[in-house]
Regions:
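Secondary-structure capping and boundary motifs in well-ordered enzyme cores
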Residues: 74-82, 109, 113
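Active-site recognition of the HExxH zinc-binding catalytic motif
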Residues: 83-96
Length: 186
């Protein structure tokens, strides 16, 4: 399967980015370690699991090295990009409880939710030691996320107010634009 990744563009509608190869210079799980990501996501009730290096990743929508979601499990291999793990984790956080209950592979959601997922992904990276927001934005650009203003940084700093408002309205960030470490309830 081609490695296409949905990202907000122009009016924050999801679109497919260019296919990316395994050689993309992004942080991978093997460089960060499962424990760091699992610790970050524990308050969300997500269980992080690492599969074998040659195993297919259960629940991976895009296949290849992309992270997978099955119920409350975030699955990855050593070569899974950290941005992919955070992106899928943020889908879990942003989806409604009924979608979480039946979750297997396809996180679904609408265009506004996809924007919120990308925004929260950057915020959460700021809480991962040795990664931070800047590196996450660089990796998102390197992987092919596409935004109207060109770069993830430009979008995040100057064009993502609607994503932030969506997160605030659903109780997922506070007034200081910090994660609340809660799941969406409605």
């Amino acid at each position: 399967m081609e490695n296409l990744y949905p990202v907000p563009v122009n009016t924050m509608k999801a679109a497919a980015a260019e296919p990316v190869t395994q050689s993309a210079e992004v942080l991978r799980l093997r460089q960060v370690g499962l424990e760091a990501i699992a610790s970050l996501l524990t308050d969300y009730g997500l269980v992080c699991e690492q599969v074998g290096d040659d195993a297919a990743i259960p629940g991976s929508f895009w296949g290849d090295s992309e992270a997978g979601l099955v119920a409350d499990r975030l699955l990855a291999r050593a070569d899974t990009p950290v941005h992919s793990m955070l992106h899928e984790a943020c889908h879990y956080v942003c989806m409604t409880p009924d979608r979480r209950d039946g979750l297997h592979t396809d996180a679904g959601g609408d265009y506004d939710e996809e924007s919120a997922v990308c925004y929260l992904q950057v915020l959460l990276a700021g809480h991962l030691p040795g990664i931070g927001r800047e590196r996450m934005m660089q990796d998102m650009d390197a992987w092919g996320y596409s935004f109207r203003l060109g770069s993830t940084r430009s979008w995040f700093e100057r064009d993502a107010e609607d994503a932030c408002q969506w997160l605030l309205a659903h109780g997922l960030v506070d007034d200081l634009k910090q994660p609340t470490w809660r799941l969406r309830q409605l």
